């Protein structure tokens, strides 16, 4: 009987010691996973899809973000986060604790990079821009019809490809066109989104001034309604670069447009062909789409550069010729 009491007492003593030790261990571990890290600058780390908590712990130790992979694994198991860590590129802030890192990886707040595609670029120019970005995976994207992409600032992660961004740009353009088309002015001289996109691309290339877009669009709308050729220089430039680069270049002409260029034989040349060209000449931004679908109402039929980055508008050819003469005088003075 005494032996039973002895062993029962010993068991209870050891159990108590174990509980105390366990509680002490939990208390220690709880403090350790909350203790600030010993690194004083941010650490960039990429977690590949399918990487387990053990592999992540080793990456973190190698990068200098943690000292003990085992403690990281135990912390992940203890908090239940070990199966919730998301792949991606992360920036770990200076002094982050193990718990901070687990919370970051569970949140999926990956590093967001941005690329700005400016308005008026051609598809080819956009493809070239994205192809030069070293932090994007590069694939061979399909060349979409001109004007398929909406110029904007796009977020991306290092795991994404140039094709992923192009796909988002294409979806964004379709979405913008659907939205703006439903709010269009009722008396436009065209009946399809495709035609609106063509004219928006011309407006985009004609002016970079926000307060001029609707007025320039109004000029082209008036000319279309009256059956007057658009006579837009950017359409000729597009025709020239399209031909000179064998349907691939579609960038800047690299020289001043000459009078003889206005006779260039191309369906895109709006000096030789009435109405709209067969397709867009660039990728217009949202503002140009809005301008074309809700143009300024006026009776202007002409415009020419004013020498200060904007344009001067005219109702008659006589008035326009006077403005052209003034522009040529300004240009001559600048070239002296």
Residue positions per predicted region:
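N-terminal Sec-pathway targeting helices
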Residues: 1-17
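N-terminal start-of-chain detector that recognizes signal peptides
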Residues: 15-20, 63-64, 87-89, 272-277, ...
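Signal peptide-directed extracytoplasmic domains
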Residues: 22-182
